[in-house]
Regions:
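Alpha-helical interface subdomain recognition
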Residues: 4-27, 33-175
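FAD-binding subdomain of flavoenzyme oxidoreductases
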Residues: 1
Length: 175
């Protein structure tokens, strides 16, 4: 592998020490750009997971009875589901915008980073709300909610932690 073939080797140079990004902003873009696709895929996956969690939760809320009626007919449950749907739609809009920009070949590091940050937080919150609505059943494997909660917890870590996403966003904003 030559430095021309290996972006990280080219970026590090012969000394092996990576130069400060402030010194070579074009190199920073070359190194960070491939991560955009990974983060975009994570955002897309989270959007799908959120949609599925909402569907499963609504179905459960219409099926589960308490005090002679489905729990989905109680205001508190409706409010939880409304919050879940709102978070999911906002995350979907950010993700679709980032995907459009990426597809058009535009510089979209900021938008992709925002989509990754927001979707991973949202899917974790939605999984938690779904678990709350399912109650004890949410811990049982046959409902799949316990797995969704575990899977959602990886999002704020994998592909760059939330803190890394915030650092990237701060830099793209000139800070």
């Amino acid at each position: 592998i030559t430095p021309d073939d290996d972006l990280l080797a080219a970026f590090a140079g012969a000394s092996g020490a990576a130069p400060a990004f402030e010194e070579q902003p074009e190199e920073e873009a070359r190194v960070i750009a491939p991560f955009a696709w990974e983060r975009l895929l994570m955002a897309i996956g989270a959007v799908g997971a959120m949609q599925r969690l909402i569907e499963v939760t609504v179905a459960y809320a219409l099926e589960r009875q308490a005090f002679g009626r489905p729990i989905g007919k109680f205001q508190a449950i409706r409010h939880h589901v409304a919050e879940m749907a709102t978070k999911a739609e906002a995350a979907r809009a950010l993700t679709y915008n980032a995907l459009r920009l990426f597809h058009e070949g535009q510089d979209c590091i900021q938008e992709v980073t925002m989509a990754k940050l927001v979707t991973q937080r949202a899917v974790l919150e939605i999984a938690d709300q779904s678990l709350q609505i399912h109650g004890g059943y949410g811990y049982m494997r046959e409902y799949g909610i316990e797995r969704a909660v575990r899977d959602a917890r990886l999002g704020p870590i994998g592909g760059g932690t939330d803190e890394v996403m915030k650092e990237i966003l701060g830099k793209t904003m000139g800070l």
